[in-house]
Amino acid sequence: MRFKLLCAVIVAVSLCSCSAAADFANGPADSITMPPGNRVSQTLLAGDKLVTFRSWLDIPYVKNPVEPEYQRLNIYVPEEYFHGETINGYTAKTAPILMPNGVGGYLPGKQFIPANDTRHGTPNVALYALSKGYVVISPAIRGRTLENGKAPALIVDYKAAVRWVRHNKDRLPAGDTEKIISDGLSAGGALSSLLGATGNAKEYEPYLQAIGAEEERDDIFASVVYCPITNLENADMAYEWIFNGVNTYHMGPAREMDDNMKAASDALKAAFPAYLNSLELEGYELDDDGDGSFKEYIEGLYIAAAQKALDAGENVLGLEWLEVDEDEGKVTGVDLEEYAEWATRMKAAPAFDSLNMKSFENNEFADAHFTAYAFEHSTAEKPAMADADKIYVMNPMNFIGKEGVSTAKYWRIRHGVKDRDTSLAIPAILALKLKQAGYDADVAAVWNVPHDGNYDLPELFEWLDGICKK
């Protein structure tokens, strides 16, 4: 009976929401106000907790949208804040604002909608956040398949949404605009890292002005980053540093790399140490063979993931790439070559800037190369090189520690042990550069997890509460 009643409430409330949301969305972006006296709410079951919240949908966040269907956002506010109540120690004024993005594969991303995630068997990040007292504001974002969605459209939109939130801070019914948190996975993780790294960077200003973004700050408090497909102009080298020697790839049916791909793998692996060393990460380097303290650091991340799983009672034995002292209950070593065989290669070399210029990432750069190696060895009929300025603004590494940029203070970066969409080296490098620049970066590999995100919500929100309540 309780389930039937709840479903009826959800349906009825959802139908009413559309009208109120439409009232909120009418008019130019700079004249939007919260509808006075709005009592429309939704109720969903998050685990064993009923969560009631108000919704405003499809609000334009720029004055001159070039893709109006996407340059809109949704706002979700816990009902308790309309009655002067607290949730999880937060009030309407102190509630953090979670801004998750729905981008994947550099495709257009729709707004997150609070719901239960059938894949993980848990509430999704938006619903879970509401249950913990967070305000959720989720923008839709342009992507590579739209006429006006090529790089750097997605980060421009994300920034514009943050600016809209700050511009309307006195109109929002709840939420602390100095506690804005980004969240994303895969290309969305790259986007989350870009938003966190590039706060107020002047390089984006012409793009923001062109779409009529508000003249506000776009720095944020914290970035949540899962398996980011980022640092694209160096990601091919990092991928081959791990997967060189594994010549079968699994993008669809298993296939063997051809001679051009194998040659690319060898060359890119050989080039990675020079790139890593050029970053001058204190205490981390590689020799010409790709060995050294940075390799030991990567091995340590895998060891820590396995140890955490072992301590939790999971079986990590019987893997050729993992050394375990069963008597002591300690994971003692990792063989990265054996790891690559076990994980399997997903992508042929080059993994991101493909020689035929047909990867998702090539498409993101308007069907062009973005690395010197792929451009010089291109098999495309008409090779093209992406604009250098656009390549630059798509890489968060270029902005960490840069004068005039306000990088997020707090970072949580996760990469699954079974993930072979990109190399663990990429998020690890991001975290090390952040730490060296004085930022708080919590990075870890996660046992038995593939290319995925928001799979550890209790741990995530324990971390978020820890930084938000300081």
Features from the language model and the residues they span:
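Short amphipathic alpha-helix adjacent to the substrate-entry channel of hydrolases
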Residues: 114-136
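C-terminal subdomain of alpha/beta-hydrolase-fold enzymes, centered on the catalytic histidine
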Residues: 314-469
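C-terminal motif of bacterial Sec signal peptides marking the signal peptidase cleavage site
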Residues: 16-17
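Alpha/beta-hydrolase active-site loop
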Residues: 149-171
